[in-house]
UniProtKB/Swiss-Prot annotation:
<dbReference type="InterPro" id="IPR035647">
    <property type="entry name" value="EFG_III/V"/>
</dbReference>
<keyword id="KW-0963">Cytoplasm</keyword>
<dbReference type="Pfam" id="PF00679">
    <property type="entry name" value="EFG_C"/>
</dbReference>
<protein>
    <recommendedName>
        <fullName>Elongation factor G</fullName>
    </recommendedName>
</protein>
<feature type="domain" description="tr-type G">
    <location>
        <begin position="8"/>
        <end position="287"/>
    </location>
</feature>
<dbReference type="InterPro" id="IPR027417">
    <property type="entry name" value="P-loop_NTPase"/>
</dbReference>
<dbReference type="InterPro" id="IPR047872">
    <property type="entry name" value="EFG_IV"/>
</dbReference>
<dbReference type="InterPro" id="IPR004161">
    <property type="entry name" value="EFTu-like_2"/>
</dbReference>
<comment type="function">
    <text>Catalyzes the GTP-dependent ribosomal translocation step during translation elongation. During this step, the ribosome changes from the pre-translocational (PRE) to the post-translocational (POST) state as the newly formed A-site-bound peptidyl-tRNA and P-site-bound deacylated tRNA move to the P and E sites, respectively. Catalyzes the coordinated movement of the two tRNA molecules, the mRNA and conformational changes in the ribosome.</text>
</comment>
<dbReference type="InterPro" id="IPR020568">
    <property type="entry name" value="Ribosomal_Su5_D2-typ_SF"/>
</dbReference>
<dbReference type="GO" id="GO:0003924">
    <property type="term" value="F:GTPase activity"/>
</dbReference>
<dbReference type="InterPro" id="IPR031157">
    <property type="entry name" value="G_TR_CS"/>
</dbReference>
<keyword id="KW-0547">Nucleotide-binding</keyword>
<feature type="binding site">
    <location>
        <begin position="81"/>
        <end position="85"/>
    </location>
    <ligand>
        <name>GTP</name>
    </ligand>
</feature>
<dbReference type="InterPro" id="IPR009022">
    <property type="entry name" value="EFG_III"/>
</dbReference>
<feature type="binding site">
    <location>
        <begin position="17"/>
        <end position="24"/>
    </location>
    <ligand>
        <name>GTP</name>
    </ligand>
</feature>
<dbReference type="InterPro" id="IPR000640">
    <property type="entry name" value="EFG_V-like"/>
</dbReference>
Amino acid sequence: MARTIPLERVRNIGIAAHIDAGKTTTTERILFYSGVVHKMGEVHEGTAVTDWMAQERERGITITAAAISTSWLDHRINIIDTPGHVDFTIEVERSMRVLDGVIAVFCSVGGVQPQSETVWRQAERYQVPRIAFINKMDRTGADFFKVYGQIRDRLRANAVPIQVPVGRESDFHGLVDLVAMKTYLYTNDLGTDIQVSDEIPEEVQDLVAEYREKLLEAVAETDEALMEKYLEQLEGGEALTEEEIRHSLRQGTIKGLIVPVICGSSFKNRGVQRLLDAVVDYLPAPTEVPPIKGVLPDGEEGVRYADDDAPLSALAFKVMADPYGRLTFVRVYSGVLQKGSYIYNATKNKKERISRLIVLKSDERIEVEELRAGDLGAALGLKDTLTGDTICDEANSIILESLYIPEPVISVAVEPKTKQDMEKLSKALQSLSEEDPTFRVSIDSETNQTVIAGMGELHLEILVDRMLREFKVEANIGAPQVAYRETIRKSIRTEGKFIRQSGGKGQYGHVVIELEPGEPGSGFEFVSKIVGGSVPKEYINPAEQGMKEACESGVIAGYPLIDVKATLVDGSYHEVDSSEMAFKIAGSMAIKNGVTKASPVLLEPMMKVEVEVPEDFIGNVIGDLNSRRGQIEGQETDQSQSIAKVVAKVPLATMFGYATDIRSKTQGRGVFSMEFSHYEEVPRSVAETIIAKSKGN
């Protein structure tokens, strides 16, 4: 089956932002104007097309990255609407991994918020080109240029307005396109009657002149040939054409040198068609982004170009239980994925058969025969393929770069309300953990309780809610527990020697390691410096495995050991008695012996907390954060709205129930956001209490 839309006319984009910036409403309007839906859905009414989980419709927040296909100006646009709540960071992370461009939505009143910064960092990590859409221009306090300044200063982006709004706040009724130098005025509520003219309204003429000049400067700086022409224009030479500006702006955006900034009000149906034009004009096709990299079977780096005739390579970026069956969402990078075909999962070294392929219009599933290079869709029939796995041709195997998956920071014990539900609970937990890699399930070895871990209170709340709704399991939930960790502060040399003689064949394994503190965030790092065969090659891996397993339980309070580096420097073996198991045990002993002498300390997760409150309450809030062992890092006041903002680093252990506390301390007018920052040493007095508790004292 031939390709119906050329690859150059495909756009894979995400819509990402802070919670309440208006992402889902923006997606709804895009679907309305591009003809996918014929009636607008509203988030606050619970009718949005992309919010199709029951909890999303109730809470008015988008939890899972819904993938939808639409068309505009003969281009196919595949859209992923991502959640703005920090507890669902993995959804943003996995969508960034498979996108070619992003619309970053900002509220024209709230501006750059903490989650805007998180999303921006994720887009930076994957080098995804961006357009900034400053939304809610009709709101009281809306300020396009203030938010544009925040994008430049706080996100350090080379943001360049390519539009200027016409009218302020409730009078916002149009915009001037600085590339085409045309005015667009909206004359009806649906935003479908638009007056287009070459005349610039008098009240914005000075602003238009100022920002048109900034736009020309910015595009000229990304293109030497254009810079010459621009300098000649300043001296009375030929002016830059609209095509030249558009072309350079496109190239600058794709290379990440420029972020075009546009404005609108999705709720009031203003500016959405121009946003779609900008997606087509400035965001890249799959052929315009760097080829995807991966590892070939021989360990060398390989690349796959976006081409239907190249060998198949695709990444599974999400797994979801669905009434249809188990959906595995994939992004095809090269080649063609066909319904009914056998695929090779290079990550798992397994073959599987795809029974059906579908593309989504949110609730609606449309069956297709194939997915081609650059396509996003979902496969049914894959039982072993999980998030981050590579699907490819067995004859042309490659393992693509996977996703960055953050560690969970909070855990709770969970048990079914009735014994009969035990089996249903374990099925539910398995299904949910397959869908969400930041959701972990384990069994506490001492209490034998089932423990679930995630990214925050809301994350776990929603997962427990889903257990009840989708799997009909009622569960009792314990109090939240903090994911403490242990590490070392001193470098030492230590050894592990395992010898067992009990008649017949004995056991012998001996390793000498240098144990030292690792880089923050490095986890466990192993290096072998064995020369001369004091430890045979076949025993090095088992020794490393033993060390890794020993790190799963530290010596102070049994929490996992992180940020340590172990270098294998020496050892000895026995021709007959040595075995892989003996060296695995010796490796484990070396870590346990060494850690006790290497000044072990307890670490706790620190959260970046941002609180916004009316000025009158700021003293109370700062005092409260200090009492929670918080470190205040910054404070600013928006005089125009009498709102104060505080940024602090606070231990997660002291933040449980903060949502209720902040409401009572600010008469319900305070809002806050919280995300994981880093691990930090627990003060000794606090550590003693935690250690005593872990030992049951």
